[in-house]
């Protein structure tokens, strides 16, 4: 910030430390958003599992299924939730870096430095990473539902959920 100014607006001097911190904070934001999303999926899947498996005997249902699901998520499955969110955050971060590079190269084209093959290749990479991100999101959400039911770790749950999806292709 500029010292000695009496304005409501301040300027920031972007040195390398500030740039690295901004990248670090952005990655943390991606990780936290994915973690909260997967925590929500897990809690809803636990509540549905409580209801489904105690349908015949309502006395077996917990009084507060959301609180119990949150407790199970924190106590038993926090690492699995964090690992899946980290995996998704890394993929999203790579996608945003590629999108930044595409934008930078297109700005260079406006200045007269043309490289259409590079832009095409980078856009193909962004498309590939976006498709991979959607696949990981889908398999992870099904894996977290399986995790809520079976209680296994993240990788095992995703593998079993994927096997279940592949063995029943008409259902999804």
Model segments located where?
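Hydrophobic alpha-helical membrane segments
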Residues: 1-172
């Amino acid at each position: 910030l500029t010292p000695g100014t009496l304005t409501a607006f301040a300027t920031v001097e972007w040195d390398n430390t500030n740039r690295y911190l901004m990248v670090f904070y952005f990655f943390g934001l991606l990780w936290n958003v994915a973690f909260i999303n997967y925590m929500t999926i897990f809690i809803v899947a636990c509540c549905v599992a409580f209801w489904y498996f105690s349908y015949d005997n309502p006395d077996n249902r917990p009084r507060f299924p959301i609180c119990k699901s949150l407790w199970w998520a924190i106590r038993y499955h926090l690492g699995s939730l964090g690992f899946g969110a980290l995996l998704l955050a890394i993929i999203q971060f790579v996608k945003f870096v590629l999108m930044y590079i595409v934008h930078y190269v297109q700005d260079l084209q406006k200045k007269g430095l043309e490289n259409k093959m590079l832009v095409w290749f980078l856009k193909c990479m962004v498309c590939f990473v976006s498709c991979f991100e959607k696949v990981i999101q889908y398999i992870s959400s099904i894996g977290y539902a399986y995790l809520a039911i079976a209680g296994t770790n993240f990788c095992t749950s995703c593998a079993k959920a994927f096997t279940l999806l592949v063995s029943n292709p008409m259902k999804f």
